[in-house]
């Protein structure tokens, strides 16, 4: 099987999913994709021929940072095997978690739209700062995979990353993170809070991408109204 994550973690490369599916079909391989970033609102993997879709309910679908849950979806052929595996392993979730996930689904389009708008506004603002080397946001025109993103996706969610220039030390980045007034510190995303985290991508990634930055600053934007915070920044 071939497992896809699009966009890729940390540097947000967009995978050419159509080509991957062609390879899978030619070689009789199953295709799997993590669709947590885009959700079905902005990308439907089954329309591209993907066999199995994985999403973290914990993130955007829940939207309130109060559920730890995931979902695996498949077509009719694979669904039977997935259901059998779930039954044999006793891998079930509580009715309350399902109820709360349905609650999140009802507001997902509105929340995701606002998160997308805010993240792009902040990404464009950060592009103008000399201290920042790269903004990894596929909705930006200078992103190397922007055209591929436009072809396959209906939108971009609130998660993106920025890279500082090499002369900005990690300690300085940590100080910047600690002094942010709007963003809290956290590695999760997709909830009601605006969070950020710092990391060195070269130390946190098993597979090398075409471009591995020396240091990264991961940010996620909630649907908080930016204008309400302008006097605090």
What positions do the PLM features span?
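Conserved PLP-enzyme active-site core in the AAT-like
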Residues: 1-131, 136
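Short coil/turn linker and secondary-structure boundary residues
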Residues: 15, 77, 167-171, 226
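Ubiquitous "structural anchor" signal
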Residues: 71, 78, 198-199, 224
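Hydrophobic side chains in well-ordered alpha-helices
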Residues: 82, 172-176, 227
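Conserved C-terminal alpha-helix-loop-beta "cap" of PLP-dependent enzymes
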Residues: 134-222
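Conserved small/polar residues in nucleotide/adenosyl-binding loops
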Residues: 224-231
